[in-house]
Design a protein with these regions (language model features):
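Acidic/histidine-enriched, glycine/proline-rich intrinsically disordered or flexible terminal extensions
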Residues: 92-107
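Short, flexible beta-strand-to-coil junctions
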Residues: 10-13, 47, 92-94
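An amphipathic, aromatic/His-enriched active-site/gating alpha helix that lines ligand/cofactor pockets
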Residues: 26-41, 57-94
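Active-site-flanking beta-strand signature of metal-NTP-handling nucleotidyl enzymes
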Residues: 3-11, 53-55
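Short alpha-helical
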Residues: 15, 49, 62, 97
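Short, flexible turn/loop "capping" segments at secondary-structure junctions
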Residues: 1-4, 45-48
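Short, surface-exposed ligand-recognition loops at beta-strand->loop->(often short) alpha-helix junctions
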Residues: 11-23
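Short acidic/glycine-enriched loop/turn segments that link adjacent beta-strands
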Residues: 38, 48-51
Length: 107
């Protein structure tokens, strides 16, 4: 069984960046408690427009599918929806660059 690396872009709603960062930092620990992600440390960064990007690893596609039925994960995602919109990577200016660079966000 191989892992699945995902890249997610969270565009904060006005005035919600700090709440979003707190949720992003707690996302993988929450998913670990549910045994859905690997031990890989996520990479969190910021695009020029303020969008937060996270790279993390699920245990498998089955784990991703299970998350969509897990009440703890669904509750976490509802908190995300209150403070951000998930956007496609191609909406970021950096995605048009050969070597997309982002600002690292410390833990």
């Amino acid at each position: 069984m191989s892992g699945v690396i995902v890249i997610v872009a969270y565009r904060p709603k006005p005035g919600k960046e700090n709440k979003l960062l707190k949720l992003v930092r707690n996302r993988v620990p929450t998913l670990k408690k549910e045994n859905l992600v690997t031990e890989r440390v996520p990479t969190i960064m910021r695009a020029r427009d303020g969008t937060i990007i996270e790279v993390s690893e699920w245990k498998s596609q089955a784990a991703i599918d299970a998350a969509h039925k897990n009440p703890n994960v669904l509750a976490m995602w509802n908190k995300f929806f209150a403070v951000c919109d998930c956007v496609s990577l191609n909406t970021l200016a950096e995605a048009k660059e050969m070597f997309a660079g982002f600002e690292p966000i410390a833990d």
